[in-house]
Curated annotation (Swiss-Prot):
<dbReference type="GO" id="GO:0007608">
    <property type="term" value="P:sensory perception of smell"/>
</dbReference>
<keyword id="KW-0282">Flagellum</keyword>
<dbReference type="InterPro" id="IPR016024">
    <property type="entry name" value="ARM-type_fold"/>
</dbReference>
<dbReference type="InterPro" id="IPR011989">
    <property type="entry name" value="ARM-like"/>
</dbReference>
<dbReference type="GO" id="GO:0042048">
    <property type="term" value="P:olfactory behavior"/>
</dbReference>
<keyword id="KW-0969">Cilium</keyword>
<dbReference type="GO" id="GO:1902093">
    <property type="term" value="P:positive regulation of flagellated sperm motility"/>
</dbReference>
<keyword id="KW-0744">Spermatogenesis</keyword>
<dbReference type="GO" id="GO:0030317">
    <property type="term" value="P:flagellated sperm motility"/>
</dbReference>
<keyword id="KW-0221">Differentiation</keyword>
<keyword id="KW-0552">Olfaction</keyword>
<dbReference type="InterPro" id="IPR048733">
    <property type="entry name" value="CFA69_ARM_dom"/>
</dbReference>
<dbReference type="GO" id="GO:1990718">
    <property type="term" value="C:axonemal central pair projection"/>
</dbReference>
<dbReference type="GO" id="GO:0005737">
    <property type="term" value="C:cytoplasm"/>
</dbReference>
<dbReference type="GO" id="GO:0007288">
    <property type="term" value="P:sperm axoneme assembly"/>
</dbReference>
<dbReference type="GO" id="GO:0097225">
    <property type="term" value="C:sperm midpiece"/>
</dbReference>
<dbReference type="GO" id="GO:1990834">
    <property type="term" value="P:response to odorant"/>
</dbReference>
Length: 942
C-alpha cells in the first residue's frame, strides 16, 4: 500500500464513504478529520514507502549505495515530526533492511540510528481507532527493536536504548500537525509489554559483558521496563535476576552499574514472583557477588548514597537468606555478616573491621537493625550455630539488656538506643535458645531478671516508643518488659533444667507474681493489648517453671492463686473483644493445670475462694475453645474429695446445675460429631452407639500395633471422655437438678466406657476379617461373646431409656390432669360463690324467696335435730324473738346461743369457710364470739 499523502487521502475518503472493515470481529467506530490538502502538503510530502523498500531490497549494481541513502534521508526528512501509526510497519521494514546492510556497509548505521531516533518521538494517529487498528503492527515493531540489539554496532545499540527510555519521558510535539493527534505515552508503554521487548533487552544485556557503556544503557532501559509487572514477569523468564546479580561486582568507575542493577533487582522482587527471584539468586555466583559488593560498601562507603546502597544490598541478601537452600555459609557471607553485626559491641582483631566505626546517622542506624534481623533469619539453619558461637553473638546482644546509663557518652541517640535495645532483645529470643551454654556463661538469667526489675520500677526514664518493637511503650517500659518476657519464655520452654533451676533459685517466681500484680493494679490504658500480652507471658512462664515440680508449686502459693482468680473473674463480655483476652484466659487455665493441681494447699485455697465456681461459669459460656482444657482441669480437681461438694453446689442461670451443664455439653458434642440419636436422645444403633459420622466415613484398615485406631483417636479428639470422667467421679447416682432428658442422656454416659471397649473389639474383629486370619475356637468364642455383650448393653440402655421416656410421658399426663383438675375446682368454686351471691340478692329483694329460704332453713334445722331429746340438754328455739332483719346490720354480731367450745373459735379462715358455704346464704363474715356472762375474760373480738 502506498503511503503517499494523496493515496492516504483517497483511502480515507473511501473509508468515510461507507466501506466497512471486516478484519475485526467487532465494529470499531471511525472518526475522520477533514483538512485542506494544502496544509497536508506542507507537513508530509508524498512518499512511496513501497518504492523505498523495493530499492533497498535490490542488489543490482545499477542501484548505487548513494541512491539508497538518499531515499532514506528523504524518508527521515518527511517524518521528522513523528511516524503515523499506519506507516509504522513499512518504516520498520525499511529499518530492518538497513540493519541487515550494516555489517557489510557501515554507512547505513547513521540512517538506521536516525530512524530509531524518530521512534522516540510521539507516534501520530489520524483516527481515534488507529490505536486499536494498528496494535499488532506497533507491538511487532517494538519487538524488532529488541532484535536489532544483536547487531554489533555500539552507536545503534545506544540509540535503541535512548529511544526506549524516551518512551517513558515523552514530550509533547513542538509543532501541531493538522489532521493528526499525538498518541499517549501510555500506549507506547503498553505496546512494549505486548511486544515482549523486556525479554529481548535482558538477553542483550547478557551479551554485553565487556561493553560497559552499552551495558549501562541497557540497565537503564531495564530500570524503566521493570516498573511494569508484565515486563518483570518476562524478565524473570529470561533469568534476569541471576544474570544481573552475577555481574554486580564488575568494574565500573561511574558506579552506575551497581545502582541500576540493584534498582532492577528491587523492582523484580516487588512486582513479580518473589519465590522465583529468590530461587534464581540462591546460587554461589550471585551470593559471592553480593558478598563482595556489600563488603566494599561497608568498609569503603562513606557517602550518603553509598550507605543507602549498602543497606539495599543487605535487604536483598536478607530476602535470599530466607531460602534454606541458599549457600550462605559456603560462600562465607554468613561469617562476614555476623562479624559486621557484632564488631561494635565485641572488639575484634579482624583487619576488616579493626579501624571501622559506625556513625550516628540514619543509614548506619538502619544497617544495625538490618544486621540484627538477618541474624534471626540465619540462625534458623543449625549449621550457623558454631559461627554464632565464634562471633560471640550472645555477648554482643546482651550488652543492650541493661538500663541506660545517663552519664555515659552514647553512640546513638536515646530514641535510637531504645529501638536497638528492643531489636537486640527480640534477636536474643531467637538466638539464645540455640546457644544455652553461651547464654549461661554470660549470666543470662541474672541479666534478664535485673533488667525486668528495672522495667517494673517507675522512674523518670522517658520511653519514646516510636518504632515497630516499641509499639505501645511510649511514656512507660511496657515494650522493654514485653520483649524481655518473650525472651524469658523462650528460655523456660526449652525445659532445660539448668536454666530453670537457676531462675527459680534467683526468685523468678515471686518476681513474676509481683510483675503481674503491678499490671493488675494499673488502670485501663490505651496499651491494653500490650498489658494483656505481658500478663499472658507471665503466666506461661510460671506454668513452664512449676509443671511437675511440687516445691515450685508451693512457691507459687496463695499469691499465685489470687492472680489466677483475678483473671478468671474477668467480665465474660471481654472474651468477645479480641484475641488478647482469649490468650490470657488460655494462659490462666494452663497455670491452673501446671501451678495449682498437685499441690494440696493450693488446691484447697482455690476451692475455698470458689475457684471451681469460676471454672464452671466459664464452662457455661459455651466457648468450645475452652471446654476441653476446663474439663481436663475438672477431672484432675475431682480427685480432691472436697471438690464434689463445690461442683454440686454450683448454680448457673435458670438454676442450672453442674451435672445438667455437663450433660448438655455432651449432647451438643454428639450433635456436632453426627452421632445417631432419635428426637428423644435415645440410642438408634445398639451395635455402635457412640459412632460418629467421621468414623462411619472411614473404612477400617489394618494398622500397626503402635498406631492408634480411629476408635482410640476419638477419645482424644472430643470432650466426651472427659465429661464421663467428671460425672463418674461425682457419682452417677447422686446428681442434682437433672431433667428427664438429662437422665436419658446420662444412661449413655454411664455406659460410655463399656461402649468404647465394644468399639475397639469391633475394630479388632473387622481387621481380622480384612487380613483373612482365622482365630482358634476359644478366641473366636471369646471375641463373639464380647461383641454380643456390648450389643446387649446397648439394648439394655435403649430399653431403660424407653422406660424413662414412657414414665416421663405418663408423668407429664398426670401433671396435666392435676393442673386441669385444679382449674375445674376453681371454676366450680367460682360458680358456687356466684350462685350463693345470686341467692342472697334474691332473698333481699323478694319476700316470697325470703320466706321460702326461711322454710328451707327451718326444715334443715329440724332435720338435723336428734329424734330423741337427750336428758339435761338445752333446747334452742329456731326463731329468735325480736329479730327483725334478715342480714346483720353491724360489723359485730354477738352469738349467745352456741358455746365457743363447739365452734372451735372465730371463723377467721375465709378459705376454710368457703369450702362449706353457709346454708343461710349471704356474704361471708368474721364473727365475734361472746362468752357467757360468767366468763368475761375469754371474749375474743375479731
Amino acid at each position: 500500500m502506498s503511503t503517499a499523502e494523496a493515496s492516504a487521502t483517497t483511502a480515507d475518503a473511501a473509508e468515510a464513504g461507507g466501506r466497512t472493515k471486516t478484519g475485526s470481529p467487532r465494529t470499531i467506530p471511525v472518526f475522520g478529520v477533514a483538512i485542506p490538502d494544502g496544509e497536508m502538503q506542507g507537513i508530509f510530502k508524498p512518499m512511496d514507502l513501497n518504492r523505498i523498500i523495493k530499492v533497498l531490497e535490490e542488489e543490482d549494481k545499477d542501484v548505487s549505495e548513494e541512491k539508497q541513502l538518499n531515499y532514506i534521508k528523504k524518508l527521515i526528512h518527511c517524518y521528522q515530526n513523528g511516524f503515523p501509526l499506519r506507516d509504522l510497519a513499512q518504516i520498520f521494514k525499511i529499518l530492518s533492511l538497513c540493519a541487515e546492510k550494516i555489517e557489510k556497509q557501515p554507512c547505513f548505521v547513521e540512517p538506521a540510528s536516525d530512524i530509531i531516533k524518530l521512534c522516540g518521538l510521539p507516534f501520530l494517529k489520524k483516527k481515534v481507532s488507529d490505536e486499536i487498528t494498528y496494535t499488532e503492527d506497533t507491538a511487532n515493531s517494538f519487538a524488532l527493536l529488541g532484535e536489532l540489539m544483536k547487531i554489533p554496532s555500539s552507536a545503534l545499540r545506544i540509540q535503541i536504548c535512548k529511544c526506549i527510555v524516551d518512551f517513558y519521558h515523552a514530550e509533547p510535539l513542538k509543532k501541531h500537525i493538522p489532521g493528526y493527534q499525538q498518541v499517549s505515552s501510555s500506549y507506547k508503554i503498553k505496546m512494549v509489554e505486548v511486544g515482549g521487548l523486556a525479554k529481548a533487552m535482558v538477553q542483550s544485556a547478557l551479551l554485553l559483558e565487556n561493553q560497559l557503556v552499552e551495558k549501562l544503557w541497557v540497565l537503564k532501559v531495564l530500570q524503566h521496563l521493570s516498573t511494569s509487572g508484565v515486563n518483570c514477569t518476562l524478565m524473570v523468564k529470561a533469568q534476569a535476576a541471576s544474570g544481573i546479580c552475577a555481574h554486580l561486582n564488575d568494574p565500573d568507575p561511574s558506579g552506575q552499574l551497581l545502582f541500576r542493577s540493584s534498582e532492577v533487582l528491587w523492582n523484580l522482587l516487588e512486582k513479580s514472583s518473589k519465590e522465583e527471584i529468590i530461587q534464581q539468586l540462591s546460587n554461589l555466583e550471585c551470593l559471592l557477588a553480593l558478598k563482595e559488593v556489600f563488603k566494599n560498601l561497608f568498609v569503603r562507603g562513606h557517602s550518603h548514597y553509598e550507605r543507602q546502597l549498602r543497606n539495599d544490598i543487605l535487604v536483598i541478601t536478607t530476602i535470599i537468606a530466607q531460602n534454606p537452600g541458599a549457600p550462605m555459609i559456603e560462600c562465607g557471607f554468613t561469617r562476614d555478616l555476623i562479624l559486621f553485626a557484632t564488631f561494635n559491641e565485641v572488639k575484634s582483631q579482624n583487619p576488616l573491621v579493626k579501624s571501622l566505626k559506625l556513625f550516628n546517622c540514619y543509614e548506619d542506624f538502619e544497617l544495625k537493625k538490618l544486621l540484627f534481623n538477618i541474624i534471626v533469619i540465619l540462625c534458623k539453619d543449625l549449621a550457623t550455630v558454631q559461627l554464632l558461637i565464634d562471633g560471640k553473638v550472645i555477648l554482643a546482644l546482651f550488652t543492650y539488656v541493661k538500663k541506660p546509663e545517663r552519664l555515659k557518652i552514647m553512640e546513638w541517640s536515646a530514641a535510637q538506643y531504645e529501638e536497638l535495645q528492643l531489636h537486640a532483645i527480640a534477636t536474643l529470643s531467637s538466638v539464645a535458645p540455640l546457644l544455652i551454654e553461651e547464654y549461661m556463661s554470660c549470666h543470662g538469667n541474672s541479666r534478664i531478671l535485673a533488667f525486668l526489675e528495672w522495667c517494673g520500677h517507675e522512674d523518670s526514664y522517658f520511653i519514646h516508643g516510636n518504632s515497630f518493637h516499641g509499639t505501645g511503650g511510649r511514656g512507660n517500659k511496657f515494650a522493654q518488659m514485653r520483649y524481655t518476657l518473650r525472651l524469658l519464655r523462650a528460655m523456660v520452654y526449652l525445659e532445660d533444667e539448668t536454666v530453670n533451676k537457676d531462675l527459680c533459685e534467683r526468685g523468678v517466681i515471686h518476681q513474676l507474681i509481683e510483675i503481674f500484680k503491678t499490671m493488675m493494679s494499673r488502670p485501663a490504658e490505651k496499651e491494653e493489648a500490650i498489658a494483656l500480652e505481658i500478663q499472658s507471658d507471665t503466666l506461661l512462664i510460671l506454668s513452664g517453671l512449676c509443671e511437675n515440680y511440687i516445691q515450685r508449686k508451693e512457691m507459687f502459693g496463695t499469691e499465685g492463686v489470687d492472680i489466677v482468680l483475678h483473671v478468671m473473674k474477668t467480665d465474660p463480655k471481654n472474651l468477645q473483644r479480641g484475641l488478647g483476652y482469649n490468650v490470657l484466659l488460655f494462659s490462666t487455665l494452663d497455670s491452673i493445670w501446671c501451678c495449682i493441681l498437685g499441690c494440696y494447699d493450693s488446691e484447697d485455697y482455690f476451692l475455698e475462694k470458689e475457684g471451681i465456681f469460676l471454672l464452671l461459669d466459664i464452662l457455661a459460656l459455651n466457648q468450645k475453645k475452652f471446654c476441653n482444657l476446663i474439663l481436663g482441669i475438672m477431672v484432675e480437681f475431682c480427685d480432691n474429695p472436697k471438690t464434689s461438694a463445690h461442683v454440686n453446689a454450683w448454680r448457673g442461670k435458670k438454676d442450672l446445675t453442674a451435672a445438667s451443664l455437663l450433660i448438655k455439653l455432651w449432647r451438643k458434642e454428639e450433635k456436632e460429631l453426627g452421632v445417631k440419636r432419635d428426637r428423644n436422645g435415645k440410642i438408634v444403633d445398639t451395635k455402635r452407639p457412640l459412632f460418629t459420622s467421621f468414623q462411619e466415613e472411614q473404612k477400617t484398615m489394618p494398622l500397626p500395633a503402635n498406631c492408634p485406631s480411629i476408635a482410640v483417636m476419638d477419645v482424644a479428639e472430643n470432650i466426651r471422655a472427659k465429661i464421663y470422667a467428671v460425672l463418674d467421679k461425682l457419682d452417677f447416682e447422686n446428681l442434682p437438678g437433672l431433667s428427664a432428658e438429662d437422665f436419658v442422656t446420662l444412661c449413655i454416659i454411664h455406659r460410655y466406657f463399656d461402649f468404647k471397649i465394644g468399639e475397639i473389639w469391633n475394630e479388632v474383629s473387622e481387621e481380622i476379617k480384612l487380613e483373612k486370619l482365622r482365630l482358634v475356637t476359644t478366641d473366636e468364642k471369646s471375641l463373639n461373646s464380647i461383641i454380643a455383650a456390648t450389643e446387649n448393653i446397648g439394648k439394655m440402655v435403649a430399653s431403660l431409656q424407653s422406660e424413662m421416656i414412657e414414665n416421663q410421658a405418663l408423668q407429664d399426663v398426670q401433671n396435666e390432669q392435676r393442673v386441669y383438675a385444679k382449674i375445674q375446682a376453681t371454676h366450680k368454686q367460682r360458680e358456687q360463690a356466684n350462685k350463693s351471691w345470686e341467692n342472697f340478692l334474691a332473698r333481699t329483694s323478694n319476700a316470697k324467696t325470703l320466706k321460702k329460704a326461711k322454710k328451707l332453713q327451718e326444715k334443715a334445722i329440724e332435720s338435723s335435730r336428734y329424734t330423741e331429746r337427750p336428758q339435761n340438754a338445752t333446747f334452742h328455739q329456731t326463731v329468735i324473738k325480736g329479730l327483725n332483719t334478715t342480714v346483720p346490720s353491724g360489723r359485730v354480731v354477738t352469738v349467745q346461743s352456741t358455746p365457743t367450745r363447739l365452734l372451735g373459735g372465730p371463723l377467721a379462715d375465709t378459705d376454710i369457710a368457703l369450702k362449706k358455704l353457709p346454708i343461710r346464704g349471704g356474704a361471708l363474715q368474721r364473727v365475734k364470739v361472746k362468752p357467757p356472762l360468767n366468763d368475761p375474760k375469754k371474749s375474743i373480738p375479731t
